[in-house]
Amino acid sequence: MRAVIPYKKAGAKSRLSPVLSLQEREEFVELMLNQVISSLKGAGIEQVDILSPSVYGLEEMTEARVLLDEKDLNEALNRYLKEAEEPVLIVMADLPLLSPEHIKEISSTEKDVCIVPGKGGGTNALFIKNPSKYRVKYYGSSFLTHCSIATDSGQDFEIYDSFMAGTDIDEPEDLVELLIHGKGAAKDYIESKFRLEVKKGRVGLVPL
């Protein structure tokens, strides 16, 4: 099996712009990417590909193979799946709470497809045993769409429901979860800029 991580560093994570500058966001997404790669390698996945529209930020990448594709996310991934001859795990790059243990559990499914839902109806990971028979359609309520795609193509699927694997970092409030539950370089980076504070019974971020 192999894993593929869609990734774009330039202008990344615009929804974090209220709390992080462009430079900080680009530094942060690179740290998250490296943690995801480390988790994949820790789970025993030797072949890790990064699918990106640009080499920006990946010039010195040695832990994964960089594949350039300027097409949109769905077109690029569907081309990748069509050419794959072994099971594929698609993992988003903004999952710093994802562990090797999660990855092992996801990829050990007895079903044809394992779908990891993200917040707001998204899809954080997809394990596909027969990639040439499956297509992806991200954006919008992609989790429901990916369930339907599996059913319509005659493939049974499992839903891997996990808080940690389901926590993608998109909004400022997601950084709270990273500080509470995370570890590693991505957490350390945010911890160098913010502290947690309880206000009106809710935990929030306060700049240092």
Swiss-Prot record:
Top enzyme category: transferase
GO molecular function: GTP binding; phospholactate guanylyltransferase activity
Top-rank lineage group of the source organism: Archaea
Signal peptide: none
UniProt EC number: 2.7.7.68
Annotated keywords: GTP-binding, Nucleotide-binding, Nucleotidyltransferase, Transferase
Pathway(s) of this molecule: Cofactor biosynthesis; coenzyme F420 biosynthesis
InterPro entries membership: CofC, Nucleotide-diphossugar_trans
A Pfam family hit: CofC
PANTHER family: 2-PHOSPHO-L-LACTATE GUANYLYLTRANSFERASE
Quaternary structure (record): Homodimer.
Protein family according to the UniProt entry: Belongs to the CofC family.
Function: Guanylyltransferase that catalyzes the activation of (2S)-2-phospholactate (2-PL) as (2S)-lactyl-2-diphospho-5'-guanosine, via the condensation of 2-PL with GTP. It is involved in the biosynthesis of coenzyme F420, a hydride carrier cofactor.
Protein's recorded name: 2-phospho-L-lactate guanylyltransferase
